């Protein structure tokens, strides 16, 4: 089965072609960082307009790379939520219209489900059940994954998502948008730090997260410093250490409570070097397994949507009718 995947939930336009027999045939991505940098964050209206401009060229690009024609496609999968409503509507309307023109099924895909399954796309031998740590700019969750569509939420953030906390902390210290990755690089390059930040919500039972207080702690530390480059790097390192250790502590609890020693890390923050290294060390110590998507599939992309769509379409699933129903807020579990 050949499935075209379309991702347009926020500020990246992703398109891919996945084959149930041969795997991922091609994918292409347009990032809108340059468009939004001048505004210091994502502007929803501009994001929607950018998707309109790039969807058709990207579809043509992936079909050419895959050496297939539109009429060879068996289905089209698209992100229907959660995300920015305008951006979601652009991708969903395009997908439904193209599917109608080609007389093939279209299927709405949950953005978070696509992230959860991204590691399985590259490692088909990854079996259910597993625990997933979903860490991105909009989410920070621990999820028990028992099968496709069978999810149980174990823990969620009570305020900021972890990627959001990275970006906001960077901005508070004068690092321009998108500053989260820059903050992480500063932390990686800093050899040591005199600062010790709190590990939020690790002193109580449960698997929920909270990062707003950590962000405030970083701001206060920055304001009390001389605001030199060395201060920025040392605060970045202390902040990242606190985030990583907090995530590790919560993952340990989740694994201990479950019957599986398989951990899947999904979402853009899954590309963080310090987090990857710490998780790999810990999971090795307990003789468990940890799976990460390749770096290019950690952030939003069309490949994960095409893959999730292919799995569901092979089970006979598809949208009913031409109606477009996107869900800006859409709980996974």
Curated annotation (Swiss-Prot):
Enzyme class, UniProt record, top EC level: transferase
Gene Ontology CC terms, in alphabetical order: cytoplasm
Cofactor note: Binds 1 Fe(2+) ion per subunit.
Catalysed reaction equations from the record: L-threonylcarbamoyladenylate + adenosine(37) in tRNA = N(6)-L-threonylcarbamoyladenosine(37) in tRNA + AMP + H(+)
Paired cysteines (S-S): none
Listed EC numbers: 2.3.1.234
Protein name per its UniProtKB record: tRNA N6-adenosine threonylcarbamoyltransferase
Organism: Legionella pneumophila (strain Corby)
Gene coding for it: tsaD
């Amino acid at each position: 089965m050949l499935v075209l995947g379309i991702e347009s939930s926020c500020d990246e336009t992703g398109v891919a072609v996945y084959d149930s027999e041969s795997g991922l045939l091609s994918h292409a991505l347009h990032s809108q960082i340059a468009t939004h940098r001048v505004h210091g964050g994502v502007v929803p209206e501009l994001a929607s307009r950018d998707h309109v401009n790039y969807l058709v060229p990207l579809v043509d690009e992936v079909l050419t790379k895959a050496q297939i024609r539109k009429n060879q496609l068996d289905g089209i999968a698209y992100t229907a939520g959660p995300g920015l409503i305008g951006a979601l509507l652009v991708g969903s309307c395009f997908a439904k219209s193209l599917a109608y023109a080609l007389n093939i099924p279209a299927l709405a895909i949950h953005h978070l489900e696509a992230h959860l399954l991204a590691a399985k796309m590259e490692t088909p031998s990854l079996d259910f059940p597993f625990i997933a740590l979903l860490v991105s700019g909009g989410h920070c969750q621990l999820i028990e994954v028992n099968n496709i569509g069978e999810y149980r939420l174990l823990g969620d953030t009570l305020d900021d998502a972890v990627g959001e906390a990275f970006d906001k902390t960077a901005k508070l210290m004068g690092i321009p948008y998108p500053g989260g990755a820059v903050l992480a690089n500063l932390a990686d390059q800093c050899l040591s730090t005199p600062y010790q930040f709190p590990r939020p919500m690790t002193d109580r039972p449960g698997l929920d997260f909270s990062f707003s207080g950590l962000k405030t702690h970083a701001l206060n530390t920055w304001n009390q410093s001389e605001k030199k480059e060395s201060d920025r790097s040392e605060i970045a390192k202390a902040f990242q250490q606190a985030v990583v250790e907090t995530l590790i502590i919560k993952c340990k609890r989740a694994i201990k409570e479950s019957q599986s020693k398989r951990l899947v890390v999904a979402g853009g923050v899954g590309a963080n070097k310090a987090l990857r290294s710490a998780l790999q060390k810990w999971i090795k110590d307990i003789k468990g397994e940890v799976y990460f998507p390749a770096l290019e599939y950690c952030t939003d992309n069309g490949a994960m949507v095409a893959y999730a769509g292919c799995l569901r379409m092979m089970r006979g699933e598809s949208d009913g009718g031409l109606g477009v129903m996107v869900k800006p807020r859409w709980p996974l579990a």
